[in-house]
Amino acid sequence: MIFGYNRCYRIIGFKRGRVESGCELMIYDEKRTGGAGMVEKEEFYLNSTNGVNKLHVILWHPLEEIRAIVQISHGMCEYVDRYDRLATFLAQHGMMVIGNDHLGHGETAKSEEELGYFPKAKGSETVVDDLYKVTKSIRARYPRIPYFLLGHSMGSFMARRYLMTYGSQLDGAILMGTGSQPPALLSAAKTTANSLSVVRGEHHRSQLMMKMAFGSYNKQYPSVRTEYDWLSRNDANVDTYLEDPYCGFMFTLNGYKVLFDVLSFIQEPAHILSLIHISEPTRPY
C-alpha cells in the first residue's frame, strides 16, 4: 500500500519498533548522528478534534538538553516528514521538533481519495484546533521550555489563525512563504468553489480551481520544465516533489473551501478607532 497507515513499513534504520493493527498504534524510534548531537525520532497518532480521524504526528527529540520546541504546520499537498532534514538539524542543535499531517494530508489521510479533503472539518477551525491539540500534548510534558510555531505556505495561514486564537500559548512564531489575496479575487474563488461543489460534490477535483489557485505561479519564469517549477529553483527538489505520492495531488473542492476559509479569516480587517486626550500621560510624545 502507498496510502494509509502501511506506509510506516518504509521506515529505514529504526532501532526499536512496535506495530499493531496496520500501524494505527505504530510507534518507532530512530537514532541519528551527524552534526552536533544525537536525535531520536518518534512517530505516533492523536485523535483529531473532528472526532473521526487520527492525526499522524512525528517528534524529533534531541538526546541532550532541550533548548526550545518548534512545532511545524506544513503546507498544502505535502506532509510533515518532508521537513525531516530541517527537523533533524534543529534537533541536533538542541531543539525538539514536532508536527502533524493535517487532515487530508500524509498519513492522516486514510486513503488516496481523502488526500486534499478535510473530513468533518468546520472550515480551517478544525485544522487549527488539531494544531493546538498537538501543542497541548507536548506542552504538558515540557511546560517551561520556550515554544515556537513554524508555518509554511498554507501552513502559515493556519499558523496565523492559530496566533489569533491560541497565540498566548506560544513564545514566538515563524511564518514562511505566507501571503494574502485581493478580496475581490478571494470572493470570486469562494463563489466558484461553492457553486461547483453544489453541482459536482465536495470530493470533486477541479482543473478550473487549480488554474485559479496556481495558474499564474510559473508565469514569472521565462522557461519551465514542469507545472511546479515555482516551488524551488533546485530542479532536484521539484522532481522529488513530483515523484512523491503524498505531494502534488489535486485538492478537492472541499479542500479549496477550507483554504479560502482560512484566508478570509486571517484577512478580515479590524476597524479600530484610537482616542487619546492631549493630556493623557500615556500618549506618545
Please give the residue ranges for each predicted region:
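Alpha/beta-hydrolase-fold enzymes
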Residues: 159-246
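Single conserved hydrophobic/aromatic residue that forms the stacking wall/gate
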Residues: 276-285
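Short beta-strand element of the alpha/beta-hydrolase
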Residues: 67-75
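Alpha/beta-hydrolase active-site loop
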Residues: 119-139
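Serine-hydrolase catalytic-loop signature spanning alpha/beta hydrolases and amidase-signature enzymes
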Residues: 77-85, 97
